């Protein structure tokens, strides 16, 4: 099965607005991304030369104004920090350092072309985009932490979330051009000017519908994966009378170069799965995960020098100790037979196939049941007893027989987080992947007894170069 080369999909996301004088400081204490301009280190001498370049950020950024967002990457050797109106990836954690929700955070409004949002720009204003299933819980969480902070928190029902991608070299080059030209600002005033220029450039959007674009972000969780768009009206095909027609939304030049057909959200989710980009919505709501297990450090969602926030202690300690034992990785399920094993052993990418026979086998199990099954190495070889290796006279059995080879009970190598058709995500022990990428689970068979289903784990090619597991 091949995915469409390009398309636009509406996402099942909900939006919460946080607005007010203390909005920046309030959110800085709750999310994993840096919001405040000052560098926080326990010891002054640990501030690097690159970080010193940004020492005057507190003079440039007035957090009491609608200033935008700071963008950084912990894997950037130059430790660049840019200020922009575009959105960023982040997470909310609980006090134990476990993920409450992943999110995209947007500076609202994205632009003020033609003075469309003059009134909104008068105070700090942010939009939080999360899985629509958890909107009530997220709004409650924000209100619990509000205390005396001067902010207003509201769920917004008339803002719509969209995702566009095009798997072409030309689109990748366009996004590079857009980022280099419009999203490399170093102060808030320039950031707003550049956002206005981008909207008016017609590179992607038709400037005539600028008043309908309230949020924008290049999705750099994986470099140039796509773009995220927030609108105040729904987008639709020409034959519908509500909202904005897609043909009117994108510029004429953009439509001449790229397809802009509407696709389903399922396509976006499957494309994420193929590329190994996990989101919280992929797992059961009650699933508890750590931010590093969700690869937050790989997807530009973590700051290491932002100071205190909920869940910080375990997160920073884990990073500094360098002990990350498990990560969520893309997997493909397959029929466990000799022919299929030989074929998939040499397969270097996730291949979606809804007609695969293994899909019927997996249909018998719900998500919760799958998550409880142990992932074990596909090849479970006999392991010789330690006693038989010893030269000690006590190595032999006291009952006169020779020591026998036994099978050491294998600990689970991981667990299934999600499954759709023949692909999914699994939380995998990294040390296992170094030795082997083929695993199995035992599932009930219609004929009675148990049946083995194979699993291949793929390491995404966009991950930073790995140290030894």
UniProtKB/Swiss-Prot annotation:
Residues 1-43 form a transit peptide. One of its GO terms (cellular component) is mitochondrial matrix. It is found in: Mitochondrion matrix. GO terms for biological process: iron-sulfur cluster assembly. Residues 390-401 have a biased composition (Low complexity). InterPro entries: TrmE/GcvT_dom1, YgfZ/GcvT, YgfZ/GcvT_CS. Keywords: Mitochondrion, Transit peptide. GO terms for molecular function: transferase activity. The keyword Transmembrane helix does not apply. Belongs to the GcvT family. CAF17/IBA57 subfamily. NCBIfam families: ygfZ_signature. This is Iron-sulfur cluster assembly factor IBA57 homolog, mitochondrial. The lineage of its organism: Eukaryota, Fungi, Dikarya, Ascomycota, Saccharomycotina. The gene is CAF17.
């Amino acid at each position: 099965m091949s995915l469409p080369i390009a398309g636009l999909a509406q996402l099942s996301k909900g939006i919460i607005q946080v607005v007010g004088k203390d909005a920046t400081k309030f959110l800085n204490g709750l999310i994993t991304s840096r919001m405040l301009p000052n560098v926080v280190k326990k010891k002054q001498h640990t501030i690097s030369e690159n970080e010193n370049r940004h020492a005057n950020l507190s003079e440039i950024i007035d957090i009491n104004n609608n200033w935008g967002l700071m963008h950084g990457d912990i894997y950037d050797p130059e430790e660049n920090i840019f200020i922009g109106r575009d959105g960023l990836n982040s997470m909310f954690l609980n006090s134990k350092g476990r993920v409450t929700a992943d999110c995209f955070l947007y500076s609202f409004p994205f632009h003020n072309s033609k003075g469309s949002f003059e009134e909104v720009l008068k105070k700090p204003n942010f939009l939080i985009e999360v899985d629509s299933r958890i909107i009530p819980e997220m709004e409650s969480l924000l209100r619990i932490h509000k205390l005396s902070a001067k902010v207003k928190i509201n769920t917004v029902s008339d803002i719509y979330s969209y995702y566009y991608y095009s798997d072409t070299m030309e689109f990748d080059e366009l996004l590079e051009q857009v980022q280099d030209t419009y999203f490399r600002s170093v102060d808030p005033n320039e950031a707003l000017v550049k956002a206005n220029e981008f909207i008016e450039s017609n590179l992607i959007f038709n400037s005539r519908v600028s008043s309908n674009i309230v949020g924008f972000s290049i999705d750099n969780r994986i470099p140039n994966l796509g773009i995220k768009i927030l609108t105040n009206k729904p987008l639709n095909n020409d034959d519908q009378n509500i909202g904005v027609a897609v043909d009117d939304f994108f510029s004429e030049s953009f439509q001449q170069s790229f397809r802009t057909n509407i696709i389903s959200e399922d396509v976006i989710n499957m494309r994420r799965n193929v590329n190994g980009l996990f989101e919280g919505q992929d797992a059961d709501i009650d699933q508890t995960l750590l931010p590093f297990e969700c690869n937050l450090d790989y997807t530009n969602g973590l700051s290491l020098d932002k100071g205190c926030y909920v869940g910080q202690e375990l997160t920073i300690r884990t990073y500094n100790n360098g002990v990350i034992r498990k990560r969520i990785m893309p997997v493909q399920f397959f029929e466990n037979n000799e022919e299929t094993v030989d074929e998939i052993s040499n397969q270097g990418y996730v291949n979606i196939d809804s007609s695969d026979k293994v899909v019927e086998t997996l249909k018998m199990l719900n998500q919760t049941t799958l998550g409880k099954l142990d992932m074990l190495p596909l090849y479970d070889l006999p392991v010789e007893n330690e006693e038989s290796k010893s030269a000690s006279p006590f190595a032999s059995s006291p009952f006169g027989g020779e020591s026998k080879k036994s099978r050491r009970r294998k600990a689970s190598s991981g667990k299934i987080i999600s499954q759709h058709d023949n692909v999914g995500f699994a939380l995998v022990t990294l040390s296992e992947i170094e030795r082997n990428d083929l695993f199995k689970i035992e599932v009930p068979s219609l004929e009675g007894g148990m049946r083995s289903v194979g699993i291949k784990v793929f390491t995404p090619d966009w991950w930073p170069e790995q140290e030894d597991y």
